[in-house]
Amino acid sequence: GFLSENVEFAKLCEQNGVVFIGPTPMQLSLFGDKSSARQLAVNSQVPVVPGTNEKTSLEQALDFYRSLQNSTNSDNPSMLIKAIAGGGGRGMRQVHSLGDISAEYARCASEAMSAFGESGLYVEALIEHAKHIEIQVIGDGKNVTHLWDRECSVQRNHQKIVEIAPSPTLEPALRKQLIDAALTMAKRSGLKSLTTFEFLVDLNAP
């Protein structure tokens, strides 16, 4: 449940000599904040979807959308507004025009606050045709290894319906690249748990 991702609960366990079966409080804090997780990927030289790497104001979201207009030579590029906290497909809004951003930003912030107790948002370019690939990784705080990949592209409302392991569509070279990226981030964070790193593979430019 939600306690498995609660930083304060993990800290209390640690302070009271109770073994918390899960990530350390530091790792929960790092990966529970998508902006800091994005920054870890950047620092690990793992490619990320173009976006903001910190809590993003409405004005910053508008500026980023304008930069997408310039970089794509399109008046109506696609952008995703996402909650910094949480998951499960909640706190996400697609926008396809500059005029829609203010209203969708407000809705997304409200949903994020209601679901996760944190209204912070960030934005990124929307990859409209993508495969969702996950790499399972396990670490003991020093050493890390992987348990291969699975494809989770069959979704409804950003929530997985079907998982196929291993992915039947990944080329060997790309599979190795994704596994290496997951292991690099796990190693840099001192992973002491079993966790999943999620990747998007752009079908238009895999």
Where are these regions (language model features)?
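N-terminal beta-alpha lobe that positions the nucleotide/phosphoryl donor
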Residues: 1-206
